[in-house]
Amino acid sequence: MKTFTAKPSDIKRQWLLIDATDKTLGRLASEVAMILRGKNKPEYTPSMDTGDYVVIINAEKVAVTGNKRKGKIYHHHTGYIGGIKSISFEKLIATHPERAIEKAVKGMLPRSPLGRAMYKKLKVYAGENHPHTAQQPQAHNI
């Protein structure tokens, strides 16, 4: 018996629609990362991108537990001396609600060209509307 390896012709991608309203950020992100990698499919192959496209709506209504809404801090560096920037989860959700989910999911994907290809299949929107109705995304419950 040989190990199954998916070929590009074997991969059939779907578009999934996930509503982030009142979903815990980390639990949502881990489920989405698994779908983007394709680990929920029987034809999963580690060296290939077998995952589906994921559209997340209502990113502004995502929940966090405890007092992370005020206490969780996101850091990044500009590349210049003394250029470390910090923003709290509360301010990030107020200004760019989709970035919190994007950062959480990106941290759960591989750090390689394959991981970057998987990340491109993630579409996050702050509100109810999204421009992917032509792809007919199927509602997916988490």
From Swiss-Prot:
UniProt keyword tRNA processing, yes or no: no
InterPro entries to which the protein is assigned, alphabetical: Ribosomal_uL13, Ribosomal_uL13_bac-type, Ribosomal_uL13_CS, Ribosomal_uL13_sf
GO cellular component, one term: cytosolic large ribosomal subunit
UniProt record, GO biological process: negative regulation of translation; translation
Keyword Ribonucleoprotein on entry: yes
Coiled-coil annotated spans: none
Source organism superkingdom: Bacteria
Family: Belongs to the universal ribosomal protein uL13 family.
Function: This protein is one of the early assembly proteins of the 50S ribosomal subunit, although it is not seen to bind rRNA by itself. It is important during the early stages of 50S assembly.
Name under which the protein is recorded: Large ribosomal subunit protein uL13
Species for this entry: Francisella philomiragia subsp. philomiragia (strain ATCC 25017 / CCUG 19701 / FSC 153 / O#319-036)
